From Swiss-Prot:
EC numbers, comma separated: 3.1.-.-
Protein name: Putative pre-16S rRNA nuclease
Any one Gene Ontology BP term: rRNA 5'-end processing
Chief localization: cytoplasm
Annotated keywords: Cytoplasm, Hydrolase, Nuclease, Ribosome biogenesis
Natural source organism: Rhizobium etli (strain ATCC 51251 / DSM 11541 / JCM 21823 / NBRC 15573 / CFN 42)
């Protein structure tokens, strides 16, 4: 497993496989999945965190079932662009996953993804209790959608036939 940039992963991803989006929290891992054309991110049920080995296996089971080619994981930078303790925890999680999978990871700036996800859920008139259940996967979808949009832009600028 390696950590790649969005430009690097655009070069190596095989067609017809999905990408998973992850929002790593202390209690849950928010999940989302792309369609096979890599245009749309869809939220999936969260993984309730127990301990790393169990969390990792649940994530790998999800990846296998969904034929995932790689992961986009939110990097929770501070608003000033500095890396805080949550960034360190995210990087440690990815380093630990290195022992478990050969699938690549992309770090994606997730600043304000949870805020944006919550606003959408509020606009949809989702109750506070339901928002709490859905917020992490909705944030994972925002993270993944940002990466998918960038991949689409890279494909268009490269003249890729899959960008239409």
């Amino acid at each position: 497993m390696t950590v790649l940039t969005i430009e690097e992963i655009a070069e190596i991803l095989p067609p017809g496989q999905a990408i998973a989006g992850l929002d790593l929290g202390t209690k849950t891992i928010g999940l989302s999945i792309s369609d096979l054309g890599r245009r749309f991110a869809t939220p999936r049920p969260v993984i309730r965190r127990i301990k790393f080995t169990i969390d990792a296996q649940a994530l790998l089971d999800f990846a296998s079932a969904e034929k995932v080619a790689g992961f986009v994981i939110g990097l929770p930078m501070n608003m000033d662009g500095s890396a805080g303790p949550r960034v360190q925890a995210t990087r440690a999680f990815v380093r630990n996953m290195e022992q478990k999978t050969a699938l690549p990871f992309i770090y994606w700036d997730e600043r304000l993804s949870t805020v944006a996800a919550e606003r959408v859920l509020i606009e949809m008139d989702v109750s506070r209790a339901k928002r709490a259940e859905r917020i992490d996967s909705a944030a994972a979808s925002f993270i993944l959608q940002g990466a998918l949009d960038r991949l689409s832009l890279l494909a268009r600028s490269a003249g890729d036939e899959f960008s239409a």
